[in-house]
């Protein structure tokens, strides 16, 4: 008889938390509800995480590792400015779409009433993403000798705001309005405007 695979309880707790964020939009997740979902006592939850804030930090670490590692790949592998920007924004939107519960963390919706350091950490993540966009846009002028009419920081902020807006719509629609819907058409329009400047 084969041994059953050992469940990584910590990962299982985080998966259940993400699922609950997806299936209970607008509702606060309590440790009692989470323990019931996981099938353990609240005390068992606290053996793996000292607080609910640490559980959310576990999700944020997953978000950071997933997004930033892929952004670094885009930066290394793609050299075309417009393709880099498109791929970075598309990565963010696809990640949110594939992880609806986690998109509530990205959006900040799931962090209302939680520890301030969680919202601060998500804010820092978006600052890092915006910095990558600024770098991409600045490298265009270095590589091609011609930049944009608008300051790269202003453009990076605009591009990130588009992605954040799409994620906000996704959360607000209770995951019905996909963030990638019409992205290619929208990107083509944005790209044309950027290249004309």
Curated annotation (Swiss-Prot):
Chain ranges of the HTH tetR-type domain: 7-67
A biological process from GO: cell division
Gene3D superfamilies: Tetracycline Repressor, domain 2
UniProt cross-references to InterPro entries, sorted A to Z: Homeodomain-like_sf, HTH-type_Tx_Regulator, HTH_TetR, NO_SlmA, SlmA-like_C, Tet_transcr_reg_TetR-rel_C_sf
Annotated localization: Cytoplasm, Nucleoid
GO molecular function list: sequence-specific DNA binding
Signal peptide: none
HAMAP family registered for this protein in UniProt: NO_factor_SlmA (MF_01839)
Function of the molecule: Required for nucleoid occlusion (NO) phenomenon, which prevents Z-ring formation and cell division over the nucleoid. Acts as a DNA-associated cell division inhibitor that binds simultaneously chromosomal DNA and FtsZ, and disrupts the assembly of FtsZ polymers. SlmA-DNA-binding sequences (SBS) are dispersed on non-Ter regions of the chromosome, preventing FtsZ polymerization at these regions.
Alphabetical list of PANTHER family matching this protein: ACREF/ENVCD OPERON REPRESSOR-RELATED, ACREF_ENVCD OPERON REPRESSOR-RELATED
Name listed for the protein in its UniProt record: Nucleoid occlusion factor SlmA
Annotated source species: Shewanella pealeana (strain ATCC 700345 / ANG-SQ1)
């Amino acid at each position: 008889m084969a041994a059953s695979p050992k469940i990584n309880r910590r990962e299982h707790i985080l998966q259940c938390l993400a699922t609950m964020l997806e299936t209970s939009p607008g509702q606060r997740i309590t440790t009692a509800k989470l323990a019931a979902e996981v099938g353990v006592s609240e005390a068992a939850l606290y053996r793996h995480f000292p607080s609910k804030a640490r559980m959310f930090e576990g999700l944020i670490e997953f978000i950071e590792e997933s997004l930033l590692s892929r952004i670094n790949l885009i930066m290394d592998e793609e050299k075309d400015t417009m393709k880099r920007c498109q791929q970075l924004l598309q990565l963010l939107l696809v990640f949110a779409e594939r992880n609806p519960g986690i998109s509530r963390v990205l959006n900040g919706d799931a962090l209302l009433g939680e520890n301030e350091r969680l919202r601060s950490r998500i804010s820092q993540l978006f600052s890092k993403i915006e910095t990558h966009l600024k770098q991409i846009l600045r490298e265009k002028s270095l590589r091609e000798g011609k930049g944009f009419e608008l300051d790269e920081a202003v453009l990076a902020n605009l591009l990130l705001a588009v992605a954040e807006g799409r994620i906000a719509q996704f959360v607000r629609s209770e995951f019905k309005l996909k963030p990638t819907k019409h992205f290619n058409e929208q990107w083509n329009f944005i790209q044309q405007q950027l290249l004309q400047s």
